[in-house]
Regions:
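C-terminal beta-signal and adjacent terminal beta-strands/loops
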Residues: 256-283
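C-terminal structural cap/anchor segments
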Residues: 149-150, 155-248
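Outer-membrane beta-barrel "beta-signal"
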Residues: 282-296
């Protein structure tokens, strides 16, 4: 399953094998309106063919409505997740988390503009949840210029926990998002973060494209740590630790040879920020990869 921009539900193409679910989904369509409802369990990926099994320790359900017009796409959704055990910096235990949100993407004269916001509630153990996320992106396309440049400017923020004195758990959880959330490195996930980014894409020749993208990361709350893309705690944080996490730059080259075959390569660098000097020693990350894809 994949919905919207993949901030909550995606197949995780890229750094991982495709992410699947076992369960049921109902889809209804009336003109430009589509409504899906589902109740599933995430799959546990096994090494052999046709041996994946459902994760009985997690349940996932919800409904996603999309209105698709010529110049506007709007989403409204509710998502629920139940996990037998999940760990955050402040608390761990059985999790019941509910997400309500909306997303809109409009094609304007100067750019394509997207806005999304969501609120989360529920509980982990005895701690009630109160978390949020906001994101926005503008895409400027100039097809009549040489190399057909496309520039993207974006911003995202997700809540972190406010510390032991707060009466709620404020750590946002992205549920089952795209794997390459911040490129193929994705050294940190979209929890407790503020992350502006910019990108430039160029069409070098027929089927040959190049892009470069940069992100900077800060902790939204200095009382919370940093997490992986699926929401696992990577490193604890305190107000004594710096807010700045680092900056990442990634370049991507792709050649679509024909409708079936493509070749791709990427180089990326994550420069660790002051947080990794104050919390514990951290190192920069250099990453490179090349691959070929065949699609039937």
């Amino acid at each position: 399953m994949s919905y919207g921009s993949g901030r909550f539900i995606d197949v995780r193409e890229g750094p991982n094998v495709r992410f699947g679910y076992d369960g049921a989904r109902i889809m209804a369509r009336a003109g430009p309106l589509r409504v899906d409802a589902f109740a599933v369990r995430p799959q546990l990926t096994k090494p052999n063919a046709f041996d994946d099994i459902a994760d009985v320790h997690q349940g996932f359900w919800g409904s996603w409505a999309t209105l698709d017009l010529s110049a506007l796409t709007a989403d409204l959704y509710y998502l629920g997740v139940e996990r037998d055990e999940f760990r955050y910096q402040k608390v761990d235990g059985k999790e019941w988390r509910h997400t309500v949100g909306a997303r809109a993407r409009a094609k304007l004269a100067v750019a394509d503009v997207e806005l999304e916001g969501a609120y989360q509630f529920g509980n982990v153990g005895a701690s009630p949840i109160s978390a949020w996320t906001i994101a926005g992106e503008s895409v400027f396309r100039r097809a009549k210029l040489p190399l057909e440049p496309t520039m993207t400017l974006g911003f995202g923020a997700t809540s972190g926990d406010r510390g032991p004195s707060s009466g709620t758990l404020g750590t946002f959880n992205p549920l089952f998002p795209r794997g390459a959330y911040f490129g193929l490195v994705s050294a940190n996930g979209p929890e407790n973060e503020v992350s502006p980014h910019a990108a430039l894409a160029l069409a070098l020749a027929e089927g040959l494209s190049f892009s470069v993208e940069a992100w900077s990361f800060w902790r939204q709350s200095t009382s919370d740590g940093i997490y992986s893309v699926p929401g696992r705690l990577l490193r604890r944080g305190t107000p004594a630790d710096a807010r700045y996490l680092g900056t990442q730059v990634e370049a991507f080259l792709s050649w679509q040879i024909d409708r079936h075959v493509s070749l791709s390569g990427t180089l990326a660098y994550f420069a660790a920020g002051a947080f990794f000097d104050t919390s514990a020693p951290g190192k920069d990350i250099a990453y490179g990869a090349a691959w070929a894809s065949y699609k039937f």
